[in-house]
């Protein structure tokens, strides 16, 4: 696994005239090496691949990063990096500009002299966009866990509970069934708070005759799922039923037509144009979707301005919504993988308008 990814990374490095890359991002480190420890760095040259870590992980690291030379780094990791580069006669080092703070860059530049630091962006992230078969298996399991969590919470949630109580039950259920944790701060937004696209769970007490939006996911074996469903407890305002049906129509239309070769803006328009047709375009203020993988928000983007080209193996969300301040909102989201001819849906929770008893 790791070796194949390193070979692809080297191809990308050669295209950018990069002889050595210093990987500081924890996500990219795990993607390349498989190492899950909390501290470490990856150094990749055109001939060698090193995992640099400290004493605490010198047993774990060789077990996980089997295709890497594991090195216990000096108190200052830059001393070890400098030594390894000198032995390979390399005097330029690329670093991840999107991960390294200015303070860290300043320290690296001083400590690594006379090695020249070169900022690069997206070398590893571009590899992560296309998922291989093993990654897709893990992501399907993460999606399955999100589905089972939603099914569980339908039998748990009741009026009189706080949103936070529901959030904690969802977190406990996902962890009990194999998740490391939730893949992001769970959104449980009830009543008028459902008009907040990112209304994370609060101490609000769930009442009757209102909507609840659940937006959540599981982080499982390093990969995220991301599922949104909106339900009712008791009969809500008829206007909310109306916008539910519009959002569902938009989402189903997008799922039916998203395919490889399409741009992110074209995919976005599939859902957005339907919502606009019904007069709610101004109440759908976020993108239709985003890439999903080791992070919950990755490329490609399904938005009004996105020129990203959808390709087989990409995993994206499809999540249109309508939000009416003071009344409530609806969002419906699934995870899909782009296939050779269209897409396959990974999440399968019911999208029928569900009304639970008060």
Label for each model-derived stretch:
Residues 1-358:
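Active-site neighborhoods and metal-handling regions in enzymes and metal-associated proteins
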């Amino acid at each position: 696994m790791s070796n194949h990814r390193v070979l692809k990374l080297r191809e990308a490095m050669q295209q950018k005239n990069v002889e050595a890359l210093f990987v500081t991002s924890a996500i990219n480190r795990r993607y390349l090496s498989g190492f899950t420890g909390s501290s470490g760095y990856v150094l990749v040259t055109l001939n060698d691949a090193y995992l640099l870590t400290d004493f605490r992980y010198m047993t774990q690291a060789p077990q996980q990063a089997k295709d890497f030379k594991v090195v216990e780094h000096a108190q200052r990791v830059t001393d070890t990096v400098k030594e390894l580069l000198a032995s390979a006669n390399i005097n330029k080092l690329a670093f991840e500009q999107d991960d390294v703070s200015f303070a860290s860059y300043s320290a690296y530049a001083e400590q690594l002299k006379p090695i020249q630091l070169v900022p690069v962006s997206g070398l590893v992230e571009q590899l992560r966009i296309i998922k291989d078969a093993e990654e897709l298996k893990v992501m399907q399991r993460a999606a399955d866990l999100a589905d089972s969590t939603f099914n569980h919470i339908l039998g748990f949630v009741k009026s009189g509970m706080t949103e936070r109580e529901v959030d904690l039950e969802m977190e406990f259920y996902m962890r009990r069934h194999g998740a490391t944790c939730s893949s992001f701060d769970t959104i449980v937004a009830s009543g008028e708070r459902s008009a907040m696209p990112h209304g994370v769970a609060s101490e609000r007490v769930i009442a009757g005759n209102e909507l609840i939006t659940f937006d959540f996911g599981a982080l499982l074996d390093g990969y995220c799922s991301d599922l949104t469903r909106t339900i009712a407890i008791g009969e809500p305002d008829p206007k909310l039923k109306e916008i539910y049906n519009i959002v569902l129509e938009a989402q189903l239309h997008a799922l039916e037509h998203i395919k490889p070769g399409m741009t992110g803006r074209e995919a976005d328009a599939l859902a957005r144009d339907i919502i606009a047709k019904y007069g709610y375009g101004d109440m759908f203020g976020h993108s239709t979707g985003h890439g999903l993988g080791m992070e919950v928000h990755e490329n490609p983007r399904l938005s009004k301005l996105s020129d990203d080209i959808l390709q087989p193996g990409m995993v994206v969300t499809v999540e249109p919504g309508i939000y009416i301040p003071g009344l409530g909102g609806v969002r419906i989201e699934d995870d899909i993988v782009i296939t050779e001819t269209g897409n396959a849906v990974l999440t399968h929770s019911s999208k029928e308008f569900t009304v639970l008893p008060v």
